[in-house]
From Swiss-Prot:
UniProt remark on domains: Consists of three domains, a large central CORE domain and two small peripheral domains, NMPbind and LID, which undergo movements during catalysis. The LID domain closes over the site of phosphoryl transfer upon ATP binding. Assembling and dissambling the active center during each catalytic cycle provides an effective means to prevent ATP hydrolysis.
List of residues binding ATP: 10-15, 126, 209
UniProt-listed GO biological process terms: AMP salvage
Record protein name field: Adenylate kinase
GO function term, MF aspect, one: adenylate kinase activity
Upper classification of the organism: Bacteria, Pseudomonadati, Thermodesulfobacteriota, Desulfovibrionia, Desulfovibrionales
Chain sites annotated for binding AMP: 31, 36, 57-59, 84-87, 91, 161, 173
UniProt-listed Enzyme Commission number(s): 2.7.4.3
Metabolic or biological pathway: Purine metabolism; AMP biosynthesis via salvage pathway; AMP from ADP: step 1/1
């Protein structure tokens, strides 16, 4: 089973991706984690990517695409869930070309829908657990408010990502995501239009529901 998942920062995309990964034993390929690995390792591609990430800008395709495609080609036998890529219409087209060229079947594309202002507030309230960044903790969402400065799931220490508190950086990321001409929403639309003739299923989810509500809807459609 091979899945693409779309959703703005703050939509719970990472959480839902982790749940699907666990249920179906998929490789969860998250472009941000790939970037962080390269940045932490001090690779040439990583250092180039960091310059753009620090400014809240889209990392150029000639840096991103080689990283992502390499990981897809070495993924496990149960398939993969690709999270955070493609982020533009150009990347969407190039990814589809690569999948077709390699004979890789795409089974599902998921889009989590969330208004921009709601997404922004969720980002600024997000707290990351030292043990698992996908443990849900957000001071602005009643259902997943942390226990003081401790993770509500495991009790681990919580921290903020600096760019989660930078409104300018958030706005830049959302400018890219919500751009329905060339940005990430346009990339999602590309796959939505392609789905009927390409043979994969396109799933739209209401991101304003609770984690459990979204999960139940998603799992009911991944069949």
């Amino acid at each position: 089973m091979n899945i693409l998942i779309f959703g703005p920062n703050g939509s719970g995309k990472g959480t839902q991706g982790a749940l699907a990964k666990k249920k179906y034993d998929l490789d969860h390929i998250e472009s941000g984690a790939i970037f962080r690995k390269h940045i932490g390792g001090g690779t040439e591609l990583g250092m180039k990517a960091k310059e753009y990430i620090d400014k809240g800008e889209l990392v150029p395709d000639d840096i991103t695409i080689p990283m992502v495609l390499d990981v897809l080609q070495s993924s496990g036998e149960n398939g993969w869930l690709l999270d955070g890529f493609p982020r533009s219409i150009v990347q969407a087209e190039k990814l589809w070309e690569a999948l077709e060229k390699d004979g890789v079947k795409l089974d599902f594309v998921i889009e989590i829908l969330l208004p921009r202002e709601v997404a922004k507030n969720r980002i600024m309230g997000r707290r990351l657990c030292e043990n698992d960044p996908n443990h849900p903790n957000n001071k602005f969402i009643d259902a997943i408010k942390p226990d003081g400065d401790k993770c509500r799931v495991c009790g681990g220490a919580l921290s903020e990502r600096a760019d989660d508190q930078d409104e300018d950086a958030i706005n830049k990321r959302h400018d890219i995501y919500y751009d329905d001409n060339t940005g990430t929403v346009a990339a999602a639309y590309f796959y939505k239009d392609l789905a009927p003739k390409a043979g994969f299923k396109y799933i739209e989810l209401n991101g304003e529901g609770t984690i459990e509500e979204i999960k139940d809807t998603l799992m009911g459609q991944l069949v």
